[in-house]
Swiss-Prot record:
Enzyme Commission number: 2.7.7.9
Family: Belongs to the UDPGP type 2 family.
Protein name per the record: UTP--glucose-1-phosphate uridylyltransferase
Keywords: Carbohydrate metabolism, Nucleotidyltransferase, Transferase
Recorded metabolic or biological pathway in which this protein acts: Glycolipid metabolism; diglucosyl-diacylglycerol biosynthesis
Matches recorded under PANTHER family: UTP--GLUCOSE-1-PHOSPHATE URIDYLYLTRANSFERASE
Keyword Hydrolase listed: no
Protein function: Catalyzes the formation of UDP-glucose from glucose-1-phosphate and UTP. This is an intermediate step in the biosynthesis of diglucosyl-diacylglycerol (Glc2-DAG), i.e. the predominant glycolipid found in the S.aureus membrane, which is also used as a membrane anchor for lipoteichoic acid (LTA).
Keyword Transferase among record annotations: yes
């Protein structure tokens, strides 16, 4: 069985929920404290043993490439000024993994974005990490899925429970059998209508997929939003070859919409020793 050493991170979206901030800046570069959100995703992949990462980009996404590239002039200035801690952080962001880029030429959905990286992946199993969710866990969320893949040899989809009122926002699984945190899946449903979801187990932006998924994506018809949906292709693949779901452990932070982004920033700041005390005083002083 081939090891999972490659990952795809889709980053071609327009970031319309954060306009006008994302008119000229990629949504993925919006910072949580002192790191852009996409760095948290790359760090998770690297901690899981991923060596090669392909980031699927679009127009106006050059800042992502610049962030993970080395900046010798900046490093030299930091070194000359004795700012060793900042120098270490800057160098760390360029050494996380081998990072490559491919452009999604049309906005045709997540499934289409994944297809854009087919040549890079070749005939190997691979991971997919979406940038709307930062997950804090002792074992990286995607590593938990990799472990299940290595036990079963089958594709694995990361899920977590969501409130029933929110199920229409996600891909949802219809579980067949349960073994610990692992599920056999009867059906995958992309964004079911309110009140029709078969469960409250939602697909949460972490996948380990076998290369066969590309054949299903190639023939996949447009689905929700008139886009090529990855969930629809996974559903078809599941009909031919079992796809598992795994309820991964970890605290999930939704940074794909404004309120979640603000909540995440506040929580991360409260965990930071240099900010906690003063921020706590500030919040108390608001008298909310």
């Amino acid at each position: 069985m081939k090891k999972i050493k490659k990952a795809i991170i889709p980053a071609a979206g327009l970031g319309t929920r954060f306009l006008p901030a994302t008119k000229a800046m990629p949504k993925e570069m919006l910072p949580i404290l002192d790191k852009p959100t996409i760095q948290y995703i790359v760090e998770e992949a690297a901690r899981a043993g991923i060596e090669d990462i392909i980031i699927v980009t679009g127009r106006h996404k050059r800042a992502i490439e610049d962030h993970f590239d080395s900046q010798k002039e900046l490093e030299m200035v930091l070194k000359e000024k004795g700012k060793s801690e900042l120098l270490e952080k800057v160098q760390y962001s360029t050494e996380l993994a081998n990072i490559f880029y491919v452009r999604q030429k049309e906005q045709k959905g997540l499934g289409h974005a994944i297809s854009s990286a087919r040549q890079f992946i070749g005939n190997e199993p691979f991971a997919v990490l979406l940038g709307d969710d930062i997950v804090e866990s002792e074992v990286p969320a995607v590593k938990q899925l990799i472990d299940v893949y290595e036990e079963t040899g089958h594709s694995v989809i990361g899920v977590q429970e969501v409130p029933e009122a929110d199920t229409h926002r996600y891909g949802i699984i219809d579980p067949l059998t349960k073994n610990g945190r692992q599920y056999e899946v009867k059906k995958f449903v992309e964004k079911p209508a309110q009140g029709t979801a078969p469960s409250n187990l939602a697909i949460m932006g972490r996948y380990v997929l076998t290369p066969e998924i590309f054949d299903y994506l190639k023939t996949q018809k447009e689905g929700a939003g008139n886009e090529i949906q990855l969930t629809d292709a996974i559903e078809r693949m599941n009909n031919d070859n079992q796809v598992y779901a795994y309820d991964f452990e970890g605290e999930r932070y939704d940074v794909g919409e404004k309120l979640g982004f603000v909540k995440t920033t506040i929580e991360y700041a409260l965990k930071d020793d240099s900010m906690r005390e003063e921020l706590t005083r500030f919040i108390k002083a608001l008298g909310l």
